[in-house]
């Protein structure tokens, strides 16, 4: 295949970043020199589409055949949903068809994209990612202080939340802690989750299950087309290790088994 013949000459480095959009953008800001040529992945795809249909693009075929050099190409997590499935399966071929790239930055690649990269590079890939706050007794104290400032009342509930989270400080618990917050509207359930998430370094990942009453819920939880949103994609892109599944009781009970396995 084409990339196996000249891959090392076409892309100097590949960096796979796993984590949130915020952290990915911060990583790029710290690592991309301002004087270098950087293009987004979708600009590369536009060039690829023009080469497939030169008569429609209005660009001369000779110009389309030239290999262009760029210092950096950035593939964001949202880009995969904007291309056809064959682009993911032939990712390396398509990326290198018209471009010679210094550094290819890839955020949260789908399995097919990662396999394409690993096959071409024989595992020679740099892996970076978001780092999450480790829960310690000191962090628990900070969480409690912030909860006390952000949520009025509910003193007993706050203590129960901290008690439930304490076992994560021992380092012996392999699964996430699941806390059920229940009560009428306006008592601080969502605000408590938001406060904890901010104390742990980022915005809350909130999954609104009351909006999922049809096949949409099944596709979101178990996965569907790459262009559709999914629980797995949202979890990989989270900013903190706090996930709020809001109005869990309003989803079809058939989905409960999936979460019993997960948690």
Spans of model-derived segments:
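Walker A/P-loop
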Residues: 2-41, 175-207
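A short, well-structured beta->alpha microelement
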Residues: 2-6, 21-23, 28-69, 79-88
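Conserved catalytic network of the ASCE P-loop NTPase/AAA+ motor domain
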Residues: 6-9, 57-69, 93-101, 170-174, ...
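AAA+/P-loop NTPase substrate/partner-engagement loops
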Residues: 47-48, 199-227
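Conserved AAA+/SF3 P-loop NTPase catalytic/coupling segment centered on the Walker-B
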Residues: 57-88, 239-263
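Sensor-1/coupling segment of RecA-like P-loop NTPase cores
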Residues: 76-84, 91-122
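Conserved ASCE P-loop NTPase core motifs with emphasis on AAA+ ATPases
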Residues: 111-148
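Pre-Walker A (pre-P-loop) alpha-helix and adjacent loop at the N terminus of AAA/AAA+ ATPase modules
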Residues: 137-178
């Amino acid at each position: 295949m084409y990339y196996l013949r000249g891959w090392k000459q076409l892309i100097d480095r590949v960096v796979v970043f796993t984590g949130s959009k915020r952290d990915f953008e911060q990583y790029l800001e710290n690592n991309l020199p301002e004087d270098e040529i950087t293009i987004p992945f979708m600009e590369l795809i536009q060039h690829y589409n023009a080469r497939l249909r030169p008569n429609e693009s209005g660009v001369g075929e000779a110009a389309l055949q030239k290999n262009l050099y760029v210092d950096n190409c950035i593939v964001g997590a949202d880009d995969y949903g904007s291309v056809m499935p064959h682009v993911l399966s032939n990712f390396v071929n398509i990326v290198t068809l018209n471009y010679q790239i210094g550094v290819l930055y890839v955020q949260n690649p789908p399995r097919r994209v990662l396999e394409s990269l690993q096959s071409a590079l024989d595992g020679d890939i740099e892996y970076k990612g978001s780092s999450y706050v480790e829960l310690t007794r000191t962090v628990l104290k900070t969480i409690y202080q912030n909860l006390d400032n952000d949520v009025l009342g509910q003193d007993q509930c706050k203590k129960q939340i901290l008690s439930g989270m304490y076992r994560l400080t021992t380092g012996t618990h392999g699964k996430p802690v699941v806390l059920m917050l229940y009560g009428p509207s306006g008592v601080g359930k969502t605000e408590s989750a938001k406060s904890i998430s901010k104390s742990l370094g980022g915005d809350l990942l909130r999954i609104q299950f009351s909006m999922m009453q049809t096949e949409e819920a099944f596709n979101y939880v178990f996965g569907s087309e790459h262009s559709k949103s999914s629980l797995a994609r949202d979890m990989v892109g989270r900013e903190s290790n706090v996930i709020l599944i809001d109005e869990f009781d309003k989803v079809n009970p058939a989905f409960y088994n999936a979460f019993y396995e997960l948690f």
